[in-house]
Amino acid sequence: MNIFDDRIYIFGDDSRQLALFNLFLEKGYNAAYSTDCFSNNNKKIKYSHHFYEDNLCTGTDFLIFPIPLKKRSIDNLFPFAHKNNYIIGGLFDKELTAFCNRNNICYYDLYLSKNFVTSNAKITAEGAIFCAMQNSTKTIAGSKSLVIGYGNCGCKIAGMLKCMNSEVHVIEPAKKTYIGRNIRLYKNITEVRNIHRFDFIFNTAPQKTLVDDILCRLKKM
């Protein structure tokens, strides 16, 4: 297989997908980019000079989606997908993997790669802390930080904050016996007193944790 002869279709509506599209173009790949993939019409599309709109998806070799990827969010595209497609994304739901297996569509879930998960967590942690520094007049050093969730990203964020001399507090429902020296651990957010006194709060939990009454308390800071 010569990848320069294959077609790559990138779906998504943020700068990461656009950056990936531009990277493929710079490398000479045959790529297209849609910013409107989760609606019933894909009109906002940019193409490389090899792509033709009358053949969208039906001959595409690689379909790259944002993470996470659920079947119901891209159902409008499935009539065009076929066994020659290769779906790439992450955190696929069971419905999507079952559909691909049933229709002999190849797929790859990036989150099945430990190296990808670790690298992605590091990059996400660095980006989150960088954004916090950019948008605050306070420094990380000497600050009081709360990290909600202690999965891959939460662990990396807490570790980096600690290295930058922040007082780190972590909320983790599945209490771990050890998460690092000098890190205060809470089982849930209701155990945290005076939440408004934290200088930085990083929410990595997959469920809604900062509910309205807590956000109202933060607004009074």
PLM feature segments, named:
Residues 39-45, 96-102, 175-183, 195, ...:
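Short loop/helix-cap segments at secondary-structure boundaries that form the rim of catalytic
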Residues 27-44, 164-181:
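NAD(P)-binding Rossmann-fold cofactor-contacting core
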Residues 8-20, 24, 141-162:
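Glycine-rich adenosine-cofactor-binding loop
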Residues 59-60, 68-87, 180-221:
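Rossmann-like adenosine-cofactor binding region
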Residues 47-55, 108, 184-191:
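Short acidic-hydrophobic, aromatic-tinged amphipathic segments that line or gate anion-handling sites
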Residues 35-39, 92-94, 111-116, 173-176, ...:
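Short, acidic/turn-prone active-site loops that include or flank metal/cofactor-
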Residues 2-4, 62-81, 85-141:
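Glycine/serine-rich phosphate-binding loop and adjoining beta1-alpha1 elements at the start
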Residues 4-5, 9-37, 45-51:
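N-terminal accessory targeting/assembly segments
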